[in-house]
Amino acid sequence: MKLAVIGGDGIGPEVTAEALKVLRAVRQDVEVTDYDLGARRYLRNGELLSDADFASLREHDAILLGAIGAPGEVPPGVLERGLLLKMRFALDHHVNLRPSKLYPTSTSPLANPGDIDFVVVREGTEGLYCGNGGTLREGTEHEVASEVSQNTRFGVERVVRDAFQRAMGRRKHVTLVHKTNVLVNAGGLWQRTVNEVAQEFPEVTVDYNHIDAATIYMVTDPARYDVIVTDNLFGDILTDLAGAVTGGIGLAASGNIDASGANPSMFEPVHGSAPDIAGKGIADPTAAILSAAMLLRHLGDEENAVRIEEAVAADVSARGDAQARTTEIGDRIAAALSA
């Protein structure tokens, strides 16, 4: 298994090291290539992502990312557009996958959260994030700024189909989240596509929520959800709320996936680089470890993905609110898997 590893910035290298430790506890065939990508490289020489980097990344089975970002040192948007989004578009990571699960001992801000266990399938290469927009008469009182939400039948259908396929392995329920009553063109395309693809999956029940209603239900009744499918912007917002109701983004893993398998998919914890605690050895690597489990599942190793997830669940339950150092958590989970 050839992995490209981008430790990145802040706590990224620390949590990624623990994820690799756990991966090696279940797989003896892990070959790693480290990549110096992120704010450190940009601040050192102004480079973000070269053609040579892309060519090399494509030679791997998957990519494991730690965190990217240096708030206050790099202007907003530079790393996001020049590195993360560039990689997403070039490697066709059209499925952004975000599982949300409330562990028994995790603290939810909800009084009665119920049994929360759902995934959000977010479209990753279209919508408002595709870079279709611009400004006119900038700096004047007549300035005009526009961002165009681009939605194609091809792009929408492949993500919707992915959501239905995932639902078949879960509780067989898909909820489309959009704003079809206002965004009638894009929303209409999404709704028609869901209706048509649903005919191929008669065992899967289908529901629809407006995005504003979905934010309410995610707080009042999150257990209603199994698989949510939505566009780029709505998915970005909704998944952060999902992280909050399940105990915070410290346990939130994600995958940026090319479902066709033509390019290596990338897996990462949702949290940022957290430069304020970098180097202190107190960052929680759990989300990075769960991202490694997602990576294995994507590559077809369901058995070891489940083993890691079960070991994480046991460790989270045992630790409760007790604080542990980054390496201690990785050591415990790796030891449990090696026993």
From Swiss-Prot:
Stretches assigned to coiled coil: none
Annotated site residue numbers, Important for catalysis: 129, 179
Positions of Mg(2+) binding: 212, 236, 240
SUPFAM superfamilies per record: Isocitrate/Isopropylmalate dehydrogenase-like
Main location: cytoplasm
Homology family: Belongs to the isocitrate and isopropylmalate dehydrogenases family. LeuB type 2 subfamily.
Reactions catalysed according to its record: (2R,3S)-3-isopropylmalate + NAD(+) = 4-methyl-2-oxopentanoate + CO2 + NADH
Requisite cofactors: Mg(2+); Mn(2+)
UniProt keyword terms in alphabetical order: Amino-acid biosynthesis, Branched-chain amino acid biosynthesis, Cytoplasm, Leucine biosynthesis, Magnesium, Manganese, Metal-binding, NAD, Oxidoreductase
EC number: 1.1.1.85
Species assigned in the record: Corynebacterium aurimucosum (strain ATCC 700975 / DSM 44827 / CIP 107346 / CN-1)
UniProt-annotated binding residues for NAD(+): 272-284
Compartment(s) of residence: Cytoplasm
InterPro entries, A to Z: ICDH/IPMDH, IsoCit/isopropylmalate_DH_CS, IsoPropMal-DH-like_dom, LeuB_actb
GO cellular component: cytoplasm
GO molecular function, one term: NAD binding
Record-level GO BP terms: L-leucine biosynthetic process
Sequence positions that bind substrate: 88, 98, 122, 212
Biological role: Catalyzes the oxidation of 3-carboxy-2-hydroxy-4-methylpentanoate (3-isopropylmalate) to 3-carboxy-4-methyl-2-oxopentanoate. The product decarboxylates to 4-methyl-2 oxopentanoate.
The protein, known as: 3-isopropylmalate dehydrogenase
